[in-house]
Amino acid sequence: MLTLQPQSLDWALAHAMRYGDTDVFPVPFEYDAIRHDWDEVRQYLVQQNVIDWVVRPHRALLSPKAKYGFRVITQLDPLDFLVFTALVYEIAADIEIQRVPAASEIVLSYRVRTEPTGQFFDPAIGYRRYLEKCREVLDAEAGFTHVAIADIADFYPRIYHHRLDNALRAATQKASHVKAIMGLLSRWNGTETFGIPVGNAPSRVLAEITISDIDEALLARGIRFIRFNDDFRIFATSHSAGYRSLAVLADLLYR
């Protein structure tokens, strides 16, 4: 059995109210209703065994991406989102410790730094800093003449649950939290054993721990790279060296 801490649910609601439940759509009006009756709603939620939480229907909607592309955004039922967010919040510090250290400025996506306001990630580390750091590497580190650019196609929708489960169990000793999270994903996905909700903060934390072993493997092979989410920039001393590094990345992802 696993129950959520009241303060974790408080934080999850603060996150939803300030940052929304997706990075695309307006905050649903239901969160205002939940906040209005929060004492009673929270009391109900803290009594639930979230390992057996029964999910509600969710929305999967297309959102424009770049000029001609689209991506599917998942908008969860508000109570499901609060439970999911609180669960990930309670293990987020363990996950962050397991990742390549933020101070190295190698992985510049979604570094966990929670605040009582509902903030999940360090606002100073993001895509802008990622682009700046790429330029700094080329300017300051001698020998690099080529940059190989790669991204993972359909990253979130193709994350295998078995891989995520293993990554979470390696990152935290809170096995019941892992079981509850994997149970939510399984119920949302039905018969499919891959994919996590796209467009929300807790999913980003899960995605980062899933790919963390790829970061470590590239570093162990002496490959100089910087990553933001599913975007890699690999620095090389020649075209052939860059291609070899791309082949290593492809092989690691395939495995």
Go through each PLM region and give its residues.
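Non-catalytic, polymerase-adjacent accessory regions of viral genome-replication enzymes
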Residues: 1-64
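Short, conserved non-catalytic motifs in the polymerase core
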Residues: 23-27, 56-85, 102-122, 187-208
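Catalytic micro-motifs at enzyme active sites that drive phosphoryl/nucleotidyl and oxygen chemistry
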Residues: 49, 57-61, 70-76, 131-140, ...
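Short, flexible active-site-proximal loops enriched in glycine and acidic residues
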Residues: 54-59, 98-100, 176-180
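Active-site-proximal segment of RNA-dependent polymerases
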Residues: 84, 88-147
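Phosphate/oxyanion-binding loops and surfaces in catalytic or ligand/nucleic-acid-binding neighborhoods
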Residues: 90, 94, 171, 252
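Conserved polymerase palm-domain catalytic core
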Residues: 121-229, 233-251
